[in-house]
Amino acid sequence: MVRTKTWTLKKHFVGYPTNSDFELKTAELPPLKNGEVLLEALFLTVDPYMRVAAKRLKEGDTMMGQQVAKVVESKNVALPKGTIVLASPGWTTHSISDGKDLEKLLTEWPDTIPLSLALGTVGMPGLTAYFGLLEICGVKGGETVMVNAAAGAVGSVVGQIAKLKGCKVVGAVGSDEKVAYLQKLGFDVVFNYKTVESLEETLKKASPDGYDCYFDNVGGEFSNTVIGQMKKFGRIAICGAISTYNRTGPLPPGPPPEIVIYQELRMEAFVVYRWQGDARQKALKDLLKWVLEGKIQYKEYIIEGFENMPAAFMGMLKGDNLGKTIVKA
């Protein structure tokens, strides 16, 4: 019998999550049935969306999330022992699957890049950047792109794809270390929003003519300020609103309607799972190709030990990470 460890939601979050909101449970898994496989987690991800999605869980449920896992026992001929897959059993060390919900890594995945990248730049965060920028914003060469949370798993890829497409890129981050990192990646202007005297003036100085595309990961008052500087027919891809996820008070008001109307702005929220099939496969192959060619750089914030899942999650929400937060089981 195999014993699995699982992090569950002990009680719903109020404000920032705390250690007492989670509970680690241990259980024995049953023997495999025909067609099933036993998975062992290698790498697990924590992402901002989990803060909001946890509201839909019942207390006692397993925390949701993807992992890169290895088939350690198999009764499924299509998934022999040793196969590496993407799975979504949540925060758990071992799980049983019939294989229908599993995804093999790209066949061209080389040994030269870590498997954990399938949870980051060549995974859901990279796809989010890809489709949000190219499909929702539809950026073209010569345009100016603004992205916040720009050193995170999504934002850093947004900026690099925008540079590949010939855009000017302005990024906002929360530390001087992150500023230096994005400058190395080739962002045209990067600033620490926590230390500037005026966000409005900083944005104006970075791009006096305004912004064609705004890739929004933050929401709140920050976004209202950016939206006030959008060019005519500007496009806004609403990916996340991490500044509001842990609020206990009322949400801030939205952007001034007159700006949205008279600038004829297009605002569209999106979830990456809209794109499936061939579109998704092409995007993954593009991302992998750009990584292998050195056109997209990546940084991972690796935390060792499954027992540290809650700490990794809470740290990510507070911006402790530079790059994609990954837990190595």
UniProtKB/Swiss-Prot annotation:
Residues the record lists as Phosphoserine modifications: 20
EC number of the protein: 1.3.1.48, 1.3.1.74
Which SUPFAM superfamilies does the entry link to? GroES-like (SSF50129), NAD(P)-binding Rossmann-fold domains (SSF51735)
Q: What does this protein do?
A: NAD(P)H-dependent oxidoreductase involved in metabolic inactivation of pro- and anti-inflammatory eicosanoids: prostaglandins (PG), leukotrienes (LT) and lipoxins (LX). Catalyzes with high efficiency the reduction of the 13,14 double bond of 15-oxoPGs, including 15-oxo-PGE1, 15-oxo-PGE2, 15-oxo-PGF1-alpha and 15-oxo-PGF2-alpha. Catalyzes with lower efficiency the oxidation of the hydroxyl group at C12 of LTB4 and its derivatives, converting them into biologically less active 12-oxo-LTB4 metabolites.
Mutation: residue 245 to A/F; reported impact is: Markedly decreases the catalytic efficiency toward 15-oxoprostaglandin E2 and (3E)-3-nonen-2-one
Give the top-rank taxon of the lineage listed in the UniProt record for this protein.
Eukaryota
Q: List localization entries.
A: Cytoplasm
Give the N6-(2-hydroxyisobutyryl)lysine positions (modified residues): 178
Q: What's any GO biological process attached to this entry?
A: leukotriene metabolic process
Q: Which sequence positions carry the modification called N6-acetyllysine?
A: 178
Phosphothreonine, modified sites: 18
**According to its record, what are the GO cellular component terms?**
cytoplasm; extracellular exosome
Q: What is its main location?
A: cytoplasm
UniProt protein name: Prostaglandin reductase 1
State the oligomer form and interacting partners: Monomer or homodimer.
Q: InterPro entries annotated for this entry?
A: ADH-like_C, ADH_N_2, GroES-like_sf, MDR_fam, NAD(P)-bd_dom_sf, PKS_ER, PTGR1
Reply yes or no: does the keyword RNA-binding apply: no
Q: Which gene encodes it?
A: PTGR1
Instruction: Write out the catalysed reaction.
Output: 13,14-dihydro-15-oxo-prostaglandin E1 + NADP(+) = 15-oxoprostaglandin E1 + NADPH + H(+); 13,14-dihydro-15-oxo-prostaglandin E2 + NADP(+) = 15-oxoprostaglandin E2 + NADPH + H(+); 13,14-dihydro-15-oxo-prostaglandin F1alpha + NADP(+) = 15-oxoprostaglandin F1alpha + NADPH + H(+); 13,14-dihydro-15-oxo-PGF2alpha + NADP(+) = 15-oxoprostaglandin F2alpha + NADPH + H(+)
